[in-house]
UniProtKB/Swiss-Prot annotation:
The C-terminal region is required for transcriptional activation. Residues 67-191, 335-522, 575-598, 663-686, 725-748, 794-866, 888-959 are annotated as: Disordered. At E9.5, strongly expressed in the telencephalon, first branchial arch, forelimb buds and somites. By 10.5 dpc, continuously expressed in brain and spinal cord. Also expressed in first and second branchial arches and limb buds. By 11.5 dpc, expression in CNS is weak but increases in mesodermal tissues. At 14.5 dpc, detected in epithelial cells in trachea, esophagus and proximal and distal tubules of the developing lungs. This is Mastermind-like protein 1. The modification N6-acetyllysine is found at K827. Signal peptide: none annotated. GO terms for molecular function: peptide antigen binding; protein kinase binding; transcription coactivator activity. Residues 1-97 are annotated as: Required for interaction with NOTCH proteins. It comes from Mus musculus (Mouse). The gene is Maml1. Keywords: Acetylation, Activator, Notch signaling pathway, Nucleus, Phosphoprotein, Transcription, Transcription regulation.
Length: 1020
């Protein structure tokens, strides 16, 4: 294999290089073609210019004649007279006026100047309407010619910042029009740059600061619409050359080549960055643009309203784009993908804009130390208004009135907050806030934009910034973002409260700050460390931030998106989320959203949160009360966390021992398990497996601890490895649990949470609120302590957790009994074993349980084995996916249960239970599957981390995942089950096969192990 692989790699490299070479050649050809076209164009330019001059002169004469005629006919409405000529004529009229004025100064080249000015005026008038050529003027080549001239020049011009196009003698309208048009037309990935470069000019245009007010207003409207209209085209058109095609038909020949060139150029920039840039521009024009226009359009008013917004363009980039990025990133983070940003951006924009609003004060403060507090409050409320209003109606408020209403609202809110926040505004040290906010803002935007997942991390960064610059930051935060504080209030709610209270409650802030500092400092640890033991306590409160953050977004998100969000957070932030419930679940553990609401009543509803935050934070009494509540909560959290830490430490030690033993066993098994041997002595291998499983069962008793301990840590994967002696085949799984499970993913938490979350998910199937609340706590074994305190006892006896959770449904009760049945074996497995037994077996019972139940009566062990082999097959497949892992986990635990000697006697009741309750569990699980479908959707992605197993366990494992994978594996799994059904020997061989399957799946291509499976099945 290695030898062919190397040649393959060698061949692949030449292939890649050849492809790249071809691409380079093609790009070079495109460049040459472009250069040749440009050269020809330049060569023909004299003649073209002469013709254009003639035509321009003729047009000018015609315009003058028409003017004279109209003036003679109606002296009153010269403008109205020009109107009949359509847009070009009116445009040409002012152009002609300009030409007349220009003729005086430039008699030397009047024709050229006339040509340029008239052509530009016509094009500028026509292009905003996308080549409005009503009177045939555009049909003359001025439109095309001008666009042709701008085609190459326009590209170079846009690359050069667009000075050449605009300055050609057009004082206001054409320059701004052409520049923005070029920005719109030639947005070959340069559009963001152009817009940023043109931010000032755009501001002047939009602000109507041009000398000719009416024109810029009309142009600003047109241009505002045009770039927005073109942006999608540009984004979709891979550089906007498509948008150019209408205006520049001459470039149509080069369209594909230009696309390729632009794509090649754009490839240099990461797609995510490009998306961020486009979404920035696009979103700035959509959601933020009303606020953005508020920042841009009324520069004078903004200067009055916000002295800090004098750098409105810069701020709009930093703030608006962070907001947009926050929306996109947050949604990406939510798993809603950045696509819904446009729609969800109001809501997400509300929550995330709050985050960014918090950063906005930094930007705002950066410019105005003079108005730090009020300015921040202003900007915060302003952004919040734009945010809250969008949340109320997606962009409704922003769309209701362009910038002026926003200006008025901002001014009103500024006044209100000036009145409300005088206390906080005064305490906020402008420079301190500036420094802190600048730090927070910059660090925030870099983290926030590129890493939507990091966004929680960026809040943690904020929190660190807050904690570091806490005293300075937080007063500013309270003032600048009393509402934005809402999102932070949970992450930094104690921070914000503590900082807000510093002015009012210094004692509480100090205590909260200490705790907050711990949380803020630990949250990064928890965020970056998956270990629940360490990250748990710190991440607990930070994750309350996430919880608040999650619920905030989650309310906006659909259930699937919520589940997805949970899923994704679980992968990365799931520890946070689960931790979040603990921190916030202190009181409302079961209701994570309510919990965020409880801890930070305002966060769940961002707008409400912002309002509440503003009012309670504004009122020192409310702040004091909130601070007291938070202090109580923090004290409770500290106590709980201490208890949890102790439990986690114990569990962690147990986990380490168990993991070490399991890893040793797994590695030994893996080393001692060549697939061919199992093919030959499958039945003999089964006793070996029994020994192995008994070993795992021995490890499983440890895994009972692992159930909780691994549950907190890599339980999901370690269990696959340890529980699944088959796991040795899944050595990757075991390694995954050990490495990724414990460290990489919060899988430690997930594992813990999976055992529990699955339990809770099962229970959650019964209680979705528990799913939300408990799985996160479970996900965070440490913070799972809160739910775990219920679940931890349960998790300590995973069967107990299943018992309670499983009590929710008959299948859950089955799981509970199951979990209790092989507590030693199943505890690590229980979440999955009982889950797998309950839900998967239920599902398998659905699928295979009819057989299994019949088999179980005859062969109680057969059930486990049939389920196990099928599960093993699933596991093999499951190895492919996290869900598969989690299910593989349950399925493997199944094998250990069955293979474990105890599993046999215990499983007979289990099988009987499965048979008896499996039908019941099938409906309950069907219900959980239905109830969990949202979860299972969330689970599926979470499934990778084991909640999907839980949801899948309850819903999918049997039905969707078990079936989906079984669908693949059903043929194989059922064959195993059937082969197992005839006799336990077949099942034992199947158990051996499960190891075989694991090893095969691990070490072999699909064809190889399928062939081997066929051989095994044939032998049986």
């Amino acid at each position: 294999m290695v030898l062919p692989t190397c040649p393959m790699a060698e061949f692949a490299l030449p292939r890649h290089s050849a492809v790249m070479e071809r691409l380079r050649r093609r790009i070079e050809l495109c460049r040459r073609h472009h250069s040749t076209c440009e050269a020809r164009y330049e060569a023909v330019s004299p003649e073209r210019l002469e013709l254009e001059r003639q035509h321009t002169f003729a047009l000018h004469q015609r315009c003058i004649q028409a003017k004279a005629k109209r003036a003679g006919k109606h002296r009153q409405p010269p403008a109205a007279a020009t109107a009949p000529v359509a847009a070009p004529a009116p445009a040409s009229a002012p152009a002609a006026a300009r030409l007349d004025a220009a003729d005086g100064p430039e008699h030397g080249r009047p024709v050229a100047h006339l040509h340029d000015t008239v052509k530009r005026s016509l094009d500028s008038a026509a292009s905003p309407q996308n080549g409005d050529q009503p009177n045939g003027y555009g049909d003359l080549f001025p439109g095309h010619k001008k666009t042709r001239r701008e085609a190459p020049l326009g590209v170079s011009v846009s690359a050069n910042g667009l000075p050449p196009a605009s300055p050609l003698g057009q004082p206001d309208k054409p320059s701004g029009g052409d520049t923005l048009q070029t920005a719109g037309k030639h947005s070959l990935g340069l559009d963001p740059i152009n817009k940023k470069c043109l931010a000032d000019s755009g501001i002047h245009l939009n602000g109507g600061s041009n000398s000719s007010e009416p024109f810029p207003l009309s142009l600003s409207k047109e241009l505002k619409q045009e770039p927005v209209d073109d942006l999608p085209c540009m984004i979709a058109g891979a550089g906007g050359s498509v948008a150019q095609s209408n205006l520049m038909p001459d470039l149509n020949l080069n369209e594909q080549e230009w696309k390729e060139l632009i794509e090649e150029l754009n490839r240099s920039v990461p797609d995510e960055d490009m998306k961020d840039l486009f979404t920035e521009d696009f979103e700035e024009k959509k959601d933020p643009e009303p606020p953005g226009s508020a920042t841009q359009t009324p520069l004078a008013q903004d200067i009055n309203i916000k002295t800090e917004f004098s750098p409105a363009a810069f701020e709009q980039e930093q703030l608006g784009s962070p907001q947009v990025r926050a929306g996109s990133a947050g949604q990406t983070f939510l798993g809603a993908s950045s696509a819904p940003v446009g729609t969800d951006s109001p809501s997400l924009g509300s929550s995330q804009t709050l985050f960014h609003t918090t950063s906005q004060p930094g930007v705002d403060n950066s410019s105005p130390n003079l108005m730090p507090a009020s300015a921040q409050a202003q900007s915060a409320q302003r952004a919040l208004t734009s945010v809250v209003l969008p949340s109320q109606g997606p962009g409704g408020a922003s769309e209701l009135s362009s910038a002026h209403q926003l200006q008025q609202i901002a001014a009103k809110q500024k006044r209100e907050q000036m009145l409300q926040n005088p206390q906080q505004a005064a305490p906020a040290p402008g420079p301190g806030q500036l420094a802190t906010w600048q730090q927070a803002g910059p660090s925030h935007s870099p983290l926030d934009v590129p890493y939507p997942m990091e966004k929680p991390a960026s809040p943690s960064g904020y929190k660190q910034d807050f904690t570091n610059s806490k005293l300075l930051m937080m007063p500013g935060v309270n003032k600048s973002s009393p509402r934005p504080g809402g999102p932070y209030l949970q992450p930094s709610h104690s921070n914000l409260l503590s900082h807000q209270s510093p002015s009012n409650l210094n004692q509480n802030p100090v205590n909260n700050q200490g705790s907050v500092l711990d949380y803020g400092n630990t949250k990064p640890l928890s965020h970056y460390k998956a270990d629940c033991g360490q990250g748990g306590p710190g991440s607990g409160q930070n994750k309350p931030a996430l919880m608040a953050y999650l619920p905030q977004q989650l309310p906006h998100l659909s259930n699937e998106q919520n589940s997805l969000f949970l899923m994704k957070p679980k992968s990365g932030n799931m520890p946070f989320r689960s931790l979040v419930p603990p921190g916030q679940e202190q009181n409302p553990s079961s209701v994570p959203v309510a919990a965020p609401a409880a801890s930070v009543g305002t966060q769940p509803t961002v707008s409400v949160a912002s309002t509440h935050n503003s009012s309670p934070y504004l009122s020192s009494q409310q702040q004091a009360a909130v601070m007291k509540q938070h202090q109580l909560l923090l004290d409770q959290q500290k106590q709980r966390e201490q208890q949890q830490q102790q439990l986690q430490q114990q569990q962690f030690l147990q986990r380490q021992h168990l993991l070490a033993e399991q890893e040793k066993q797994q590695f030994q098994r893996h080393l001692t398990r060549p697939p061919p041997q199992y093919q030959d002595p499958t039945q003999s291998t089964f006793p070996q497996q029994v020994g192995q499983f008994t070993g795992p069962s021995a490890a499983v008793p440890g895994m009972n601890n692992l159930g909780p301990s691994n549950s907190s840590c890599p339980r999901v994967f370690p269990q696959p490895g340890t529980l699944m002696s088959m796991g040795p085949g899944h050595a990757p799984v075991s390694s995954l649990p050990s490495s990724s499970g414990q460290q990489d993913r919060g899988v430690a938490q997930f594992t813990g949470s999976q055992s529990l979350p699955q339990n809770s998910l099962y229970g959650m199937a019964s209680g979705l609120a528990q799913i939300v609340a408990q799985p996160p706590p479970q996900a965070t074994s440490t913070h799972a302590h809160i739910p775990r305190q219920t679940n931890v006892g349960q998790n300590a006896s995973t069967s107990a957790a299943y018992g309670q959770n499983s009590l929710g449904s008959a299948s859950l009760s089955q799981q509970h009994s199951k979990g209790t049945l092989p507590p030693g074996l199943t505890k690590p497995q229980v979440p999955r074993v009982s889950a797998a037994m309950g839900s998967q077996n239920a599902s398998w019972q659905h699928q295979g349980m009819p057989n299994l139940s019949s088999q179980t009566s005859g062969n109680s062990s057969v059930n486990p084995f049939t389920a196990a082999p099928s599960f093993h097959i699933q596991q093999a497949h499951l190895k492919l996916a996290g869900q598969q892992f989690s299910q593989a986990m349950p399925s493997r635990p199944m094998a250990p249960l069955s293979s474990a000697g105890a599993a046999g006697p215990m499983l007979p009741p289990v099988s009987a239970q499965q048979r008896n309750s499996a039908p019941a569990s099938a409906p309950p699980q069907a219900a959980p599957q239905q109830g969990l479908p949202g979860l299972s959707p969330s689970g599926p992605e979470l499934g990778a981390f084991g909640q999907s197993p839980t949801s899948q366990m309850s819903g999918r494992p049997g039905l969707h995942c078990a079936q989906a994978y079984p669908v693949r594996t059903m043929g194989q799994e059922l064959p195993f089950a059937y082969s197992g059904q005839p006799g336990s020997s077949g099942l034992s061989s199947v158990a051996g096969h499960t190891d075989l399957i694991d090893s095969l799946l691990k070490n072999r291509t699909s064809e190889e192990w399928i062939n081997e499976l066929d051989d095994l099945l044939g032998s049986q």
